[in-house]
Amino acid sequence: ERSFGRAIANRIEQISQENGVNVFFRDLYEMNFNPILSHEELQNTNKGIIPEDIQQEHDFILQADLITLVYPLWWMGFPSILKGYLDRVLSHGFAYKTENGESVGLLKNKQMQQFITIGSNLDKYKEFGVDKSLNHCLINGLFNYCGIENVEFELFGDIHLIDDEARKAMIEVAAQKTQEKL
């Protein structure tokens, strides 16, 4: 694939491997991942019955010290396939549990970074507080709930308007931020 997101992910994979880090690269489209959380699966998950494909994702997450998400922002949210992935994978009993009537995150001692591409102007997003809203809801809100306390994100804006040099600079920002976390 020749997308900007894939170029970011490839560079992150490269810098990680150069530092001797094992990388589990999950391209949801390439995997033909089914993002639908069925009622039956939800009921089974609550009984501790986990589908094989989801158990594999759980295993990858448990092995990870650093989780990196690279995705475009669509209508102020995750692309539907990523939303479905998170719905199915960050399940009760794996990502969080209920204890004394309260939710407790189970994915402790993990770091997360997110690189989010947007077609619009980044300054406008910040002016309207969209970056803060994203942080509260999608980024730290969701993943802190699951126990991941160290979550950082970078927004890359105007991706349809910038030239290749600007894209390369953004890719290197992602590489540098990854290098700092390894």
Task: Describe these PLM feature segments.
Residues 1-94, 161-182:
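N-terminal beta1-alpha1-beta2 submodule of the flavodoxin-like/Rossmannoid cofactor-binding fold
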Residues 20-22, 109, 147-150:
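A generic structural signal for alpha->beta connector loops
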Residues 30-34, 93, 104, 140, ...:
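Generic secondary-structure boundary/loop-capping signal
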